[in-house]
């Protein structure tokens, strides 16, 4: 079974609608039940109301209603076996925040997580996993802070995403990391230790994210973390060893681990 500390939760789950995940929605639920989870959340990549641009990494706007319907039906079907929450993973694209607020109310979302993949936008912006210069890190940090100030987000997903492609944990990386961590503490929301990043690092053959120096700093500053499986296939839920290693790493870094996030309703 998953989780040596009995924290049997995960709020970072994708679906095949995002075009880079496998399996049916129900297969994720069944896998989570098999692994002994008490509560999971679906948080697929949000659509945005783009005009003239089609993203390859997220559902279309017209798919949102069916996504919501599916998750709510599964929540009812398996309510005696597992608690299921409805959410989205969203960037902070300032021009679309009013639209996001409408979506939250219309579809009665339980939560939204901040996965800030692009700055300042997807179509013409920088992918924050591969920043090209120090200023890209500063821009990422500034938008993370502005996003947290909206009060919409339950936690910051893969806050150290930039270390996937940034050359070193230099002075800028450390300063940016410190400001993101302190903002999460000020807002009383966790930062996420992302297990998909662990797989990326293994594929690259070097440390990317989660990045040790970032999490060492998080421990020193007194941050709180959630573990995010960032599930892109149902069998992600039964990768017990990766989950346990994450718990051990956070303990080593002195980072407090929580199973509580703030819900919108």
Region spans (language model):
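Non-catalytic positions within long, well-ordered alpha-helices that form the structural scaffold/packing
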Residues: 33, 105, 148-149, 219, ...
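Conserved, mostly hydrophobic/aromatic
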Residues: 12, 32, 112, 158, ...
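Conserved active-site loop/cleft motifs that coordinate metal ions or position small ligands
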Residues: 192-194, 224-230, 259-261
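An N-terminally biased module of ancient metal coordination in phosphate/nucleic-acid-related enzymes
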Residues: 1-94, 104, 166, 170-175, ...
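Active-site gating loops and adjacent loop-to-helix segments of metal-dependent hydrolytic enzymes
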Residues: 45-62, 111-129
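Mid-to-C-terminal alpha-helical segments outside catalytic/metal-binding sites
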Residues: 240-265
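Short, well-ordered coil/turn segments that N-cap beta-strands
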Residues: 5-7, 36-39, 80-86, 107-110, ...
């Amino acid at each position: 079974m998953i989780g040596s500390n009995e924290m049997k939760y995960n709020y970072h789950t994708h679906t095949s609608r995002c075009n880079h995940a496998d399996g049916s929605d129900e297969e994720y639920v069944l896998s989570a039940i098999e692994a002994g989870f008490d509560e999971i959340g679906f948080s697929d990549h949000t659509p945005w109301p783009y005009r003239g641009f089609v993203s390859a990494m997220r559902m279309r706007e017209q798919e949102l209603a069916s996504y919501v319907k599916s998750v709510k039906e599964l929540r009812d079907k398996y309510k005696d076996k597992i608690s299921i929450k409805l959410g989205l993973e969203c960037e902070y694209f300032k021009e679309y925040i009013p639209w996001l607020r409408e979506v939250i109310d219309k579809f009665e979302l339980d939560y939204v997580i901040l996965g800030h993949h692009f700055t300042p936008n997807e179509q013409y912006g920088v992918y924050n996993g591969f920043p090209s210069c120090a200023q890209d890190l500063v821009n990422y940090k500034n938008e993370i802070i502005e996003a947290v100030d909206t009060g919409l987000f339950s936690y910051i997903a893969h806050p150290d995403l930039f270390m996937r492609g940034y050359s070193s944990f230099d002075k800028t990386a450390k300063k940016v990391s410190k400001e993101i961590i302190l903002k999460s503490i000020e807002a009383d929301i966790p930062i996420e230790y992302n297990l998909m990043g662990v797989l990326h690092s293994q594929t690259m053959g070097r440390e990317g994210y989660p990045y040790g120096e970032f999490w060492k700093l998080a421990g020193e500053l007194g941050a709180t973390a959630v573990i995010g499986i960032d599930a892109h296939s149902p069998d992600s839920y039964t990768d017990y060893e990766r989950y346990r290693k994450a718990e051990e790493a956070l303990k080593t870094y002195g980072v407090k681990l929580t199973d509580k996030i703030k819900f919108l309703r």
